[in-house]
Amino acid sequence: SDGRNAAADDKASDLIGLAVRGCCSNPACSVNHPELCGRRR
């Protein structure tokens, strides 16, 4: 596997993780995206 691609994937998932945490701490966003915050209905 290509090390550069792995590093890019890690960076992307870090950014997604930050966005998800920001969304989950925002009630309006977490209500719209319960699957991101582990709140399954």
UniProtKB/Swiss-Prot annotation:
What is this protein's record name? Alpha-conotoxin-like Qc1.5
An example of a Pfam family matching this protein is: Toxin_8
Give the family this protein belongs to, as stated in its UniProt record: Belongs to the conotoxin A superfamily.
One Gene Ontology term of the molecular function aspect: ion channel regulator activity
UniProt keyword terms in alphabetical order: Acetylcholine receptor inhibiting toxin, Amidation, Disulfide bond, Ion channel impairing toxin, Neurotoxin, Postsynaptic neurotoxin, Secreted, Toxin
**Might you report a single GO cellular component term?**
host cell postsynaptic membrane
Q: Where is this region: Ser-Xaa-Pro motif, crucial for potent interaction with nAChR?
A: 25-27
Function, as annotated, reads: Alpha-conotoxins act on postsynaptic membranes, they bind to the nicotinic acetylcholine receptors (nAChR) and thus inhibit them.
**What domain of life does the UniProt record list for this protein's source?**
Eukaryota
Positions where Cysteine amide occurs in the chain: C37
Q: List the disulfide bonds.
A: C23-C29, C24-C37
Locations listed in the record? Secreted
Name the organs or tissues of expression. Expressed by the venom duct.
Keyword flag Ribosomal protein: no
Q: Which residues form the propeptide?
A: 1-21
Recorded domain comment: The cysteine framework is I (CC-C-C). Alpha4/7 pattern.
